[in-house]
Amino acid sequence: MVQKANPETKNISTAEINKIRQKKKVLSLLHTNGHTSASELAVSLKISLPTCIVLLNDLIVSGYLKNIGIGESSGGRKPTLYALAEDIFYVIACDFARYSANMAIFDCTNKFVSPVVQIDTHIDDPQLADKLYLAAKKLMADHGISGEKVLGLGVDMPGLINAKAGVNYTIKDKKHQNIGRDLKQKFNKTVYIDNDARMHAYGEFQFGAAKRYKDAIIIHWSWGLGLGIFVNGQLCSGKNGFAGEFSHIPMVENGELCICGKRGCLETIASSNTIMKRIEQGFEGNVISTLISRFKDHPEKVTPEDVILSARMGDEFCISILNEIGLALGKGLSYIIQLLNPEIIVLSGPISKAKQYVLSPIQQSLNRLCLEKISESTPIVISDMGDQSALLGTSEMIFQKVFAEMNFTDAKQLIEIESPIPIN
């Protein structure tokens, strides 16, 4: 169905090259904006309106676009609106938790076209690539989606990840660290690998509480503290893609040992790990707590979510734990706020669901440690995207990667837009 250009494309004219390039830009703009008019597209593409209409008509005939009706007029004739055909192409997104992964298929308008399925795997699973491949094939088959219409696969996972190389350096077995290469060999499509916290942040930035802002900080607060940094609308990844390791900034001299091998990291005093350590100490010390009483026969079954629920029911011990980690995170955020002066900070992840039980101590730390003029203009809000931010962020990122790779400058690499949408 989809073919890369054959050697004959080297004879393609400059005019045809420009036309193909413009069509690709139309697809990218409509994916980003949802729908728009010919005049708005012409302005964005810096081409004449008649030229733009020719491009749109070609894409409608090819089945990529559709006319969705008449828009509002700002004066004069009401414009015709255009949008992508929903079923023209898809991407698969996969979001890793600690001991499982969630996968779903999205259409070109970023809508779920499949339920989220859970895969029993983890980043050190030697069968990881095989399991993701089989799960994706089954998901596509179950929902009648042809592999020819799938542009690519996006995967977010914990670890030190070089997204450009597709390498996760946290995977213990070095021969499996290049997970991007392994998945590309399985899928034979574009594959994008990135850190889970960055994709949570990208989802929030594109679709959630940070959508209207250019300078934003998004914290995914769970077993670690993942950080997404947006400056002037751009996601900051750093030289090798390792930016945002907020969990491992040093906070306590000679503090508790962190999983990274260092002592006193923020993660040791402000994460789900901290919550579970305090609960363990509570059981050992016979602390008075409804939570301790409820789980006295099965202390290993307590989760951070149980602690938050008990705090909402007035359990003072659980409230004190959330207060402790909120104060610690607030101290960490004080450095971020004074260094970057963001427009907004968004808290996502399981611990953020504690809401006022962590927001109040965070603000208390900021009041004590930050310059007032800086901190008073930085709102801290709780995400309302739940567990969907990473999947949505990853799906959008793979779309953007595919569209970026479609901007070929060498005629030999061109893919004919008159045939269906390209995949790798």
Task: Name each model-derived stretch.
Residues A83, C94-A97, A210-K211, I218-W221:
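Short loop/turn motifs at secondary-structure junctions and domain boundaries
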Residues I105, L160-I161, I229:
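Hydrophobic beta-strand positions
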Residues N67-I68, V191-N195, I229:
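General beta-strand structural signal in soluble alpha/beta enzymes
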Residues V91-D95, V150-G154, A216-H220, G226-G228:
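Short glycine-aspartate micro-motif
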Residues M1-I68, S74-G76, L81-V117, I123-E148, ...:
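ATP-binding/phosphotransfer module of carbohydrate and carboxylate kinases, centering on a glycine-rich
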Residues S62, T109, K164-A165, N232:
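Residue-level recognition of short loop/turn positions
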Residues F112-D215, Y357-R368:
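Glycine-rich phosphate-binding loop and adjoining helix at the ATP-binding site
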Residues R212-A270, S419-N424:
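Glycine-rich phosphate-binding loop of actin/hexokinase-like ATP-binding domains
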